[in-house]
């Protein structure tokens, strides 16, 4: 993913001075949670690029603006309590997860979005920074079928100031997510 021409229209920043980038190899000077994400990518042999954004990326909209990509190329990681099991749901930034569909996909009676304290406790990441890797207490990961299957996607990378860019095929492979319909219909 180091070929700039390959990414020209898929999420390159409009203001290169606003962010700092490095591949998942190299200098270790980022927060522990970001290093944990980087190590998970390395262990999986994934080609991913972690970037730091000075102003942070607290929402999907802010992330898309910082990265310079379409909102649909941002992947939100949402934690659900499904009858006592923790399930991470991945949906594109321009969609919302449908709790009824999550419950159905997990054969649960009810799926409830986790609160901020639960997200931190279960994932080890803060809300807005959840990476879909290095998740010891998550039993399943569901990937919405409407997430783009080609090109670069951007995910949380362990802190509100960090995002990881990787190919859509890498996201599915690295997370071992189940491809299902979990987004609200529009």
Spans of model-derived segments:
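Extended, low-hydrophobicity, polar/charged segments
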Residues: 2-186
């Amino acid at each position: 993913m180091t070929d700039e021409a390959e990414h020209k229209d898929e999420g390159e920043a409009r203001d290169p001075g606003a962010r700092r980038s490095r591949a998942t190899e190299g200098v270790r000077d980022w927060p522990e949670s970001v290093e944990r994400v980087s190590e998970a990518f390395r262990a999986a042999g994934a080609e991913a690029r972690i970037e730091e954004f000075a102003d942070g990326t607290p929402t999907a909209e802010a992330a898309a603006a910082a990265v310079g990509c379409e909102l649909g190329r941002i992947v939100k990681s949402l934690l659900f309590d499904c009858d006592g099991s923790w399930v991470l749901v991945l949906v594109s930034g321009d969609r919302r997860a449908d709790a009824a569909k999550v419950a159905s996909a997990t054969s649960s009676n009810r799926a409830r979005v986790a609160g901020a304290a639960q997200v931190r406790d279960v994932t080890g990441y803060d809300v807005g920074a959840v990476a879909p890797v290095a998740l010891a207490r998550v039993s399943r990961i569901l990937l919405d079928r409407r997430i783009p299957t080609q090109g670069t996607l951007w995910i949380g990378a362990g802190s509100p100031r960090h995002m990881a860019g990787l190919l859509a095929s890498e996201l599915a492979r690295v997370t071992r997510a189940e491809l299902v319909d979990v987004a609200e219909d529009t």
